[in-house]
Amino acid sequence: MAPLGYFLLLCSLKQALGSYPIWWSLAVGPQYSSLGSQPILCASIPGLVPKQLRFCRNYVEIMPSVAEGIKIGIQECQHQFRGRRWNCTTVHDSLAIFGPVLDKATRESAFVHAIASAGVAFAVTRSCAEGTAAICGCSSRHQGSPGKGWKWGGCSEDIEFGGMVSREFADARENRPDARSAMNRHNNEAGRQAIASHMHLKCKCHGLSGSCEVKTCWWSQPDFRAIGDFLKDKYDSASEMVVEKHRESRGWVETLRPRYTYFKVPTERDLVYYEASPNFCEPNPETGSFGTRDRTCNVSSHGIDGCDLLCCGRGHNARAERRREKCRCVFHWCCYVSCQECTRVYDVHTCK
């Protein structure tokens, strides 16, 4: 069997045996484009537990936004990790879209759960504010009285509704009394808290001749890039935990506690994990690592995106790459821009 075929087969087997959130595949599958118009497709979304299936049928008109949220979460993950050994690669020929990487309770798994949960809350909240779903809209729960010279107006985005959708849908399968479910619930909530803590006021001036006699203000979500940056910082400072078992009336329950007591206890906005990450230097179908061979590296950087670290000490190749680009652009009155086309040579460095 070819290496890629073996890799995909192993991915499929591992997701079937584990608790992989394979419903994330709805963001890249054929269901994504038609989910809102055909409610019966809820039953065809892979990996849904009964509670998620009921939620899908009850809120089918916002399910395209759920799919969109997963999609923007994946895209943001790939942006944030573009210069890392693990660059949030997805496997589009498998329902387990990240391969076996998320089978372990690592920092990477913590980040992916957080950014996906945040993406769902973000996309649903935005969709409601845009009026694309009849069951939701703008928020009427303003925080505080208007200040001097301004009043509440516009459409405050309803992050409480978006957060509820994310919580009810994403957390539905995380109800087992084991450590991994506890970790996933915590990191899902950290993603939602990232959105809620970054809500900010936007205001618009009203008055004669452009004056600002009065302002109307509303609550708005940040750009999702700010959420990605915030959660990436949380990834870098994630709290390592240990698993503890204790007996309750329902049986044995696993909980998490910080491994190191001299560090601060993680808050609901922090990411947590309890298993070490692989180094991702070499291809390994067991861990889901694709390795870093042929990855572009930054020869002038001493960081993780630099050739020394990204290439794991194997060295790198260099080549000259010619690119045709627009150049010497001139604005003409009125109103167009004319450009010439130039060939430029760039040095490209890739890992051996």
UniProtKB/Swiss-Prot annotation:
Protein name, UniProt field = Protein Wnt-3a
Glycan-bearing residues: 87, 298
Give the record's GO CC terms.
cell surface; early endosome membrane; endocytic vesicle membrane; endoplasmic reticulum lumen; extracellular exosome; extracellular region; extracellular space; glutamatergic synapse
Question: What are the residue positions of the site described as Cleavage?
Answer: 26-27
- Gene designation: WNT3A
Per UniProt, subcellular location reads as: Secreted, Extracellular space, Extracellular matrix; Secreted
The entry's stated outcome for residue 334 to A is:
No signaling activity despite the presence of significant amounts of secreted monomeric Wnt3a, exhibits dominant negative properties
What is the protein's quaternary organization? Forms a soluble 1:1 complex with AFM; this prevents oligomerization and is required for prolonged biological activity. The complex with AFM may represent the physiological form in body fluids. Homooligomer; disulfide-linked, leading to inactivation. Interacts with PORCN. Interacts with APCDD1 and WLS. Component of the Wnt-Fzd-LRP5-LRP6 signaling complex that contains a WNT protein, a FZD protein and LRP5 or LRP6. Interacts directly in the complex with LRP6. Interacts with glypican GPC3. Interacts with PKD1 (via extracellular domain). Interacts with FZD5.
Q: Which Pfam families match?
A: wnt
Database matches in Gene3D superfamilies: 3.30.2460.20
> Could you state a single Gene Ontology molecular function term?
receptor ligand activity
Lipid-modified sites (O-palmitoleoyl serine): 209
As for PTM, the annotation reads:
Palmitoleoylation by PORCN is required for efficient binding to frizzled receptors. Palmitoleoylation is required for proper trafficking to cell surface, vacuolar acidification is critical to release palmitoleoylated WNT3A from WLS in secretory vesicles. Depalmitoleoylated by NOTUM, leading to inhibit Wnt signaling pathway, possibly by promoting disulfide bond formation and oligomerization.
Alphabetically sorted, this entry's keywords are:
Developmental protein, Disulfide bond, Extracellular matrix, Glycoprotein, Lipoprotein, Secreted, Signal, Wnt signaling pathway
What species is given as this protein's source? Homo sapiens
* PROSITE patterns noted in UniProt: WNT1
An example of a Gene Ontology BP annotation on this entry? cellular response to retinoic acid
Function recorded in the entry = Ligand for members of the frizzled family of seven transmembrane receptors. Functions in the canonical Wnt signaling pathway that results in activation of transcription factors of the TCF/LEF family. Required for normal embryonic mesoderm development and formation of caudal somites. Required for normal morphogenesis of the developing neural tube. Mediates self-renewal of the stem cells at the bottom on intestinal crypts (in vitro).
* CDD domains (UniProt xref): Wnt_Wnt3_Wnt3a
Disulfide bridges in this chain: 77-88, 128-136, 138-155, 203-217, 205-212, 281-312, 297-307, 311-351, 327-342, 329-339, 334-335
**Would you say which domain of life the source belongs to?**
Eukaryota
Q: Which family does it belong to?
A: Belongs to the Wnt family.
UniProt main location, coarse: secreted
